[in-house]
């Protein structure tokens, strides 16, 4: 497991907040609704990485960063999800992080979590299209549309999943829980460079994240400071090297 990274002089471990009180946590991750699909067999197909999180948390920026960091070493492609537009796919194409034919856009037409969990057909079709277009594809990043803290990927779509939150939502976000925060294979706390401006206490935020997630990893990052997301990129490399399919 990748050691948790931080940009601040605080300790990531432990249960204390550092501000003298604790918050009651009531969310039980075992109470989440069952996955309607179950784990998809790997076979010889590409590894599928889901990236989810609330609107504006930095999912597309992280996707772009991973493409920049991994594109020269891994045969990869991307599927984006938006409700009515192709905005995220267009952003990635304009940024030039991948050849344009390696980016597919899904327009969900409904709540984003529906297309990544309840009915994954459109996303699977997009993934299969990319695999047919690019034989030997090793990694497909599936970026969800912005949703709430309950949005998680079906294991029938994503072999492993990253959930992205950001400090602009306040340091209360991790302790609010929800399946995205508590069960994703990696939690990324993004935009840590803004913590002081928005009054977010990073020590509180990270301690709460670890308490909610147990042994599951947490990474803090600022893509302004580290545009290629080195810690998340290293974690993805570990998943690929291990051929990890969590829950299989």
Swiss-Prot record:
Region feature Disordered, mapped onto this chain: 1-36
InterPro entries found in the cross-reference section: CobW/HypB/UreG_nucleotide-bd, P-loop_NTPase, UreG
Compositional bias annotation for Basic and acidic residues: 1-14
Recorded GO CC terms: cytoplasm
Gene3D superfamilies: P-loop containing nucleotide triphosphate hydrolases (3.40.50.300)
Assigned keywords, A-Z: Chaperone, Cytoplasm, GTP-binding, Nickel insertion, Nucleotide-binding
Molecular function per GO: GTP binding; GTPase activity; nickel cation binding
Location relative to the cell: Cytoplasm
Annotated SUPFAM superfamilies: P-loop containing nucleoside triphosphate hydrolases
Keyword GTP-binding: yes
GO-annotated biological processes: urea catabolic process
Residues engaged in binding GTP: 53-60
Function of the molecule: Facilitates the functional incorporation of the urease nickel metallocenter. This process requires GTP hydrolysis, probably effectuated by UreG.
PANTHER family per the UniProt record, alphabetical: UREASE ACCESSORY PROTEIN G (PTHR31715:SF0)
Family annotation (HAMAP family): UreG (MF_01389)
Similarity field: Belongs to the SIMIBI class G3E GTPase family. UreG subfamily.
Quaternary structure note: Homodimer. UreD, UreF and UreG form a complex that acts as a GTP-hydrolysis-dependent molecular chaperone, activating the urease apoprotein by helping to assemble the nickel containing metallocenter of UreC. The UreE protein probably delivers the nickel.
NCBIfam families attached to this UniProt entry: ureG
Protein name according to UniProt: Urease accessory protein UreG 1
């Amino acid at each position: 497991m990748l050691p948790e990274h931080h940009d601040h002089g605080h300790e990531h471990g432990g249960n204390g907040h550092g501000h003298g009180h604790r918050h009651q946590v009531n969310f039980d991750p075992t109470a989440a609704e069952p996955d309607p699909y179950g784990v998809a067999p790997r076979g010889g197909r590409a590894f599928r990485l889901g990236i989810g999180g609330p609107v504006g948390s930095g999912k597309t920026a992280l996707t772009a960063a991973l493409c920049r960091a991994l594109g020269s070493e891994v045969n990869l492609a991307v599927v984006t999800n938006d409700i009515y537009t192709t905005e995220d796919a267009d952003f990635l194409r304009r940024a030039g992080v991948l050849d344009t034919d390696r980016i597919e856009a899904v327009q969900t037409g409904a709540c984003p979590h529906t297309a990544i969990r309840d009915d994954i057909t459109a996303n699977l079709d997009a993934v299969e299209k990319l695999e047919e277009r690019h034989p030997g594809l090793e990694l497909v990043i599936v970026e969800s549309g912005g949703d709430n803290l309950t949005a998680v990927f079906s294991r029938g779509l994503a072999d492993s999943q990253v959930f992205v939150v950001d400090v602009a939502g306040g340091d209360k976000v991790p302790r609010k829980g929800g399946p995205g925060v508590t069960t994703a294979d990696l939690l990324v706390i993004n935009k840590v460079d803004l913590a002081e401006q928005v009054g977010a206490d990073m020590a509180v935020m990270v301690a709460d994240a670890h308490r909610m997630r147990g042994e599951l990893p947490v990474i803090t990052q600022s893509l302004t400071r580290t545009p290629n997301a080195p810690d998340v990129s290293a974690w993805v490399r570990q998943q690929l090297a291990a051929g990890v399919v969590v829950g299989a």
